[in-house]
């Protein structure tokens, strides 16, 4: 389905600073095929940083993979928690507010596996102001694909949770990055 939308699904680490706090997560994202991230394959990694004055810059290279990467990330997290880096230069004693859900409105791709397609499609259409449900040419009669536009992640999850028996259904939520 991502291909039909002109993109590919990648597991992306996202971090964004807001006045009120920081959002950080690793989640599946539909990336445009025109993005440099869409061409990163196998053991290679890429980081894109966007700054106010420099715009967007990208770093690309081979990752360490598996255990070396995991242990390096773990060590970095422990150092940050223990504040062992140079105090004042990169870190200070200020406590950061961490958002578990993306605090701004975004577009989301949803995939739901259900025996009750018609009922769930009706619920989705009632719950969201702007939604597009793909009902034709789907891969399976038991799956629903939809794009929900302009929703905060927390609101999206709460609305989906209000669908009867949603906890029993296999639901995948993917950030749609244009």
For the regions a language model picked out, list residue spans one by one:
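Active-site lining segments that contact anionic ligands and/or coordinate catalytic metals
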Residues: 21-23, 44-46, 54, 105-109, ...
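A conserved regulatory-domain signal marking ACT and ACT-like small-molecule sensing domains
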Residues: 77-178
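Low-complexity, glycine/alanine/valine/leucine- and proline-rich hydrophobic stretches
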Residues: 27-52, 66-67, 128-140
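Substrate-binding/catalytic subdomain of NAD(P)-dependent oxidoreductase enzymes
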Residues: 1-39, 44-46
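Short, glycine-/Ser/Thr-/acidic-enriched flexible segments
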Residues: 31-32, 53-55, 63-66, 115-117, ...
């Amino acid at each position: 389905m991502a291909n039909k939308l002109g993109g590919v699904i990648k597991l992306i680490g996202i971090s964004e600073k807001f006045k009120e706090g920081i959002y950080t997560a690793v989640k599946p994202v539909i990336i445009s095929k025109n993005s440099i991230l869409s061409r990163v394959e196998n053991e290679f990694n890429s980081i894109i940083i966007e700054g106010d004055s420099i715009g967007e810059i990208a770093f690309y290279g081979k990752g360490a993979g598996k255990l070396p990467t995991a242990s390096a990330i773990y060590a970095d997290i422990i150092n940050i928690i223990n504040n062992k880096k140079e105090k004042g230069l990169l870190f200070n004693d200020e406590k950061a507010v961490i958002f578990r859900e993306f605090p701004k409105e975004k577009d989301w791709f949803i995939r739901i596996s259900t025996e009750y397609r018609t009922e769930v499609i009706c619920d989705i259409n009632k719950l969201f102001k702007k939604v597009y449900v793909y009902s034709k040419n789907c891969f399976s009669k038991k799956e629903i694909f939809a794009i929900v536009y302009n929703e905060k992640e927390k609101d999206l999850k709460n609305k989906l949770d209000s669908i009867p028996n949603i906890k029993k259904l296999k639901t995948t939520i993917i950030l749609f990055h244009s």
